[in-house]
C-alpha cells in the first residue's frame, strides 16, 4: 500500500473516532499499519485515550463505523482499560493520529510508562523466585 492510501485510512479512522468521541484526548494507530507492514487483509488497530472516568459508550458501533468507512476490519481499544503490556505497545510503537492537549497527553503517557516499568519489575521478581525455588505463587 502506498503511503497516501495509508494516510487516507488513518485520516478516515481518526475522523470517525472523533465524530463519535469528540472529547477524546488522543487517537493512536498501532500494529502492522503503524509499522508499515500491513497486508490487504490486515485490520486497522486503533487505541483511544478518553478523559478519566469516561469509556467508549458503544464500542461495537464505533468498530463497525470505522470498518465501513475504511472498507476493512478494524479493532478499537480504550487505552485506559487495557493492560500495561498492550498500553506500552501502543505508546512505544504506535503512531499518534490526534491529540487534543499535547501536554496533558504527554503527562498521561509518562505515567502509563512508569506503571509499566513497575509492573515489569514485579514480574521480574516473580520469575526470579520461580527460577530459584521452582514454585509459583499460589502453591
Question: Where are the regions a protein language model picked out?
Answer:
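Catalytic core of pol beta-like nucleotidyltransferases
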Residues: 1-26, 34-40, 51-139
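Short beta-strand->loop micro-motif that forms the acidic, two-metal-ion catalytic signature
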Residues: 45-48
Amino acid at each position: 500500500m502506498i503511503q497516501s492510501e495509508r494516510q487516507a485510512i488513518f485520516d478516515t479512522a481518526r475522523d470517525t473516532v472523533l465524530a463519535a468521541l469528540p472529547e477524546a484526548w488522543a487517537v493512536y494507530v498501532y500494529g502492522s499499519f503503524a509499522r508499515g507492514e500491513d497486508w490487504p487483509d490486515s485490520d486497522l488497530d486503533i487505541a483511544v485515550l478518553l478523559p478519566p472516568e469516561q469509556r467508549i459508550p458503544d464500542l461495537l458501533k464505533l468498530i463497525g463505523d470505522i470498518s465501513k468507512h475504511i472498507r476493512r476490519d478494524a479493532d478499537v481499544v480504550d487505552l485506559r482499560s487495557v493492560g500495561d503490556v498492550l498500553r506500552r505497545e501502543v505508546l512505544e510503537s504506535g503512531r499518534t493520529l490526534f491529540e487534543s492537549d499535547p501536554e496533558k497527553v504527554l503527562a498521561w503517557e509518562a505515567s502509563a510508562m512508569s506503571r509499566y516499568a513497575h509492573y515489569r519489575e514485579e514480574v521480574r521478581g516473580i520469575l526470579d523466585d520461580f527460577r530459584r525455588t521452582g514454585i509459583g505463587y499460589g502453591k
